[in-house]
Amino acid sequence: MTAKPIIVVAIGGNGICPSAVGAEMSFTAQLIHTKRTLWNLISLLDHYQVVITHGNGPQAGLVYEQMIPRTPFGVVTLVTTSQISSAITRAYEELIIENNLQGLPPLEPVLSWVRVDPHDPGFANPSKPVGQQLSSDQVAELLRYHPEYLFTDYGQGKRRLIASPRPKKVLNIADILEVIEDGKVPVALGGGGIPVFLDNHGRKEIANGILDKDLSSALLAGDLAADDFLILTNEQGVFTGYGTPSMLFHPQIESSQVQRWLSEGEFPPGSMGPKAEAALQFLAANPRGRVIVGHVEEHAEKLLDGSAGTTITAG
């Protein structure tokens, strides 16, 4: 294992491509957006063995609409993982060339398989927002052809909800460890990983759902005995009373407080809820670790020194 401390950096799908209504989704647009995100993370490579994970929410909905009907949604993750990891790798290489950066380790994408329970209640209760934010007219048009679709309010529009079972185990952790041993930066768990069922013979069947990348990343961070777990999102950090006059930002909190707020319904599913659960899961596996939640456009150094974002520790 590497001599450097390990940090798992979970980049939200919006760190690759914005989900705002009407946002451009071309590969070039994603490349530009990704370069901005990675630039804020470059300095981590001086001090950490970095492991990158990423979401696919904005991209997944668009890809699904172009696929054969009744295709398992896990196949969408398989497709988008290739596209997004290519954008991340290309953006990283361009940053190195454009800024004449020397001695940085290469990135290596790792296709990641994650076991889920076929009886998980998440299959019956879709909760994961995917795709871009849609206007009311766009939602109405989709419902004409797909009355079974479910949507949720998100920002200034709506996003579609997809079944999201809980990740149980990262199946190919050895592949990620091999990349680390080779001195490279793994880009793993794209879209939370490809959700699969295992039959009695260990054969994989792709599930009709999408995983939460933060919950999957927490599993990985625990397996790797990571020191820090950085969750990049569209918010400055953790808030209570979100969207109300009593909204309050919390720069430092302990896991017991997160657990209490979570049980009180402070963090809704499909938003901060899974991030809070992921933080608790990682800190249970590594009580000496830290979880940092911060804005995807913030510089990583500020998030790690506590001058920005929210730092969560066990206690």
Question: Can you describe what each PLM-predicted range is?
Answer:
Residues 2-315:
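C-terminal catalytic "cap/lid" subdomain
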